[in-house]
Regions:
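Accessory alpha-helical/coil subdomains and C-terminal extensions
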Residues: 28, 172-208
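Short, compositionally biased low-complexity segments
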Residues: 43-46, 138-143, 176-182
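N-terminal glycine-rich anion-binding loop in soluble enzyme alpha/beta folds
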Residues: 1-77
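Active-site histidine-anchored catalytic micro-motif
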Residues: 2, 11, 59-68, 72, ...
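Amphipathic alpha-helical segments that form well-ordered structural scaffolds
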Residues: 31-35, 111, 166, 206
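Core alpha/beta catalytic barrel or barrel-like domain that forms the active/cofactor pocket
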Residues: 49-51, 88-93, 180-181
Length: 208
């Protein structure tokens, strides 16, 4: 139920944006950070991210353009101020909805690419419910995308680790990621997507 888009006041009421996700022990960023630390000689720098969810939680799934402009503005300013970077990891959900922007995740990756430069490795981690198409993995967007395969998402830490591994290998010149997308004619309701039971379990096993 989405009675109206979440506005900036709705987001800021639940917490101020910051870079506190750096230092997480689990999840996409936790897995990414831990794996990067295992390589040694890597400096991780956090950029500003929204805090939590807006007032109303996930029921307010649409966001106003004002929200988009505010948070992407903070992120891009951080990248410009704290860079240059060798790689950037975007830990996203993947089903963001913004008034007036058809594919927000792809647009965010493009904005980051534009300020970071063509040689910076950009990896993205996504939820199982992400909406992914060719725009996100186009040359002007992300180099590699890692989506969780399980619901509940107990493999999100693993996806962060894989993103770190690929980023390091690309930077070392030992790996060149190639990405393709395919859209099968399948739509499943979210309350039947738990991969511990059928039909989602069978679908995911066949997809492997």
């Amino acid at each position: 139920y989405c009675p109206d888009p979440a506005n900036l006041e709705d987001w800021l009421a639940t917490g101020q944006p910051g870079d506190r996700f750096l230092g997480s022990s689990t999840g996409y960023t936790g897995g990414f950070e831990a794996r990067m630390a295992s390589y040694g000689g890597v400096e991780l720098i956090g950029i500003t991210s929204p805090a939590g969810m807006p007032v109303g939680g996930t029921g307010r799934s649409w966001n106003s353009k004002e929200v988009w402009d505010y948070f992407t503005g903070l992120m891009i300013a951080d990248i410009q101020a704290k860079g240059p970077f060798d790689g950037i990891h975007l830990a996203l959900h993947g089903a963001m909805a913004v008034v007036g922007i058809a594919r927000p995740e792809a647009e965010l990756a493009r904005l980051v690419r534009k300020v970071a430069g063509p040689d910076v490795v950009i990896t993205v981690s996504l939820d199982l419910h992400a909406c992914v198409d060719a725009e996100l993995v186009a040359p002007d967007a992300a180099d590699a995308v890692f989506g969780v395969k399980r619901f509940p998402h107990y493999d999100d830490t693993l996806m962060g680790q894989r993103a770190a591994d690929v980023m390091i290998r690309v930077l070392q010149g030992t790996y060149n990621p190639v990405v393709a997308t395919r859209k099968p004619g399948v739509i499943t309701p979210s309350f039947f997507q738990a991969t511990v039971r059928y039909p989602a379990r069978e679908i995911m096993e066949r997809a492997r």
